[in-house]
């Protein structure tokens, strides 16, 4: 454990362990006790700027400290906007629920920590470790996430990054969709990337920089389901080879983006 919550954030919550880490933040398991009962949450901590080098880089290209602060304040505002978007989903049984968030500005330098408290869930990757998903499991996953995407569409929200890493499982076995672009939006802004999402599951129109709509999420979910019924291999990746090279992945991606017909998944059931 390498983080403690500032007293001003949620004094009743105590961090117990780190459970995840990405380019722009870390995720911790936290608990609180009340009348003999222990409750758990996941707390994501996003740090802006993410490291001293990032701050130095912006300083070297800015005329003064005020410009530097305004730049990073803009990133904080974007992040808060993304978190606020999650308010639309509170109570939805197929979307990760955000319970609260706090923004803490540094006193000694330019910087912020954004604390986002969410329901504590099992990551899909952890859920799948050591177990083989049956066809019924995959169908249930598809149904649960389609319900999440249906609600997204009603709110005019496009997720744009459907992938196994953004899927979670409740203790009741419900599959839930998470990460509605907080870290992704920061990554796009900081690195100048024009394409959002992950290439492995990305719809061709997004990859090519063309106009797209909510159907890109359905496409990406389809690729996730395809992989789960294809011995964990993406379309056009050989099922015979044990060692998959970077070139193999690039060739498979190029075929998919060119619109070639996808082979039937190895474990596809009868339609």
Stretches with model-predicted labels:
Residues 192-206:
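Conserved activation segment of eukaryotic-like protein kinases, specifically the C-terminal portion
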Residues 97-111:
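Short beta-strand micro-motifs within the conserved protein kinase catalytic domain, predominantly
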Residues 153-169:
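Catalytic-loop of the protein kinase fold
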Residues 141-142:
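Activation segment signature within eukaryotic-like protein kinase domains
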Residues 109-124:
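Conserved short submotifs of the Hanks-type protein kinase catalytic core
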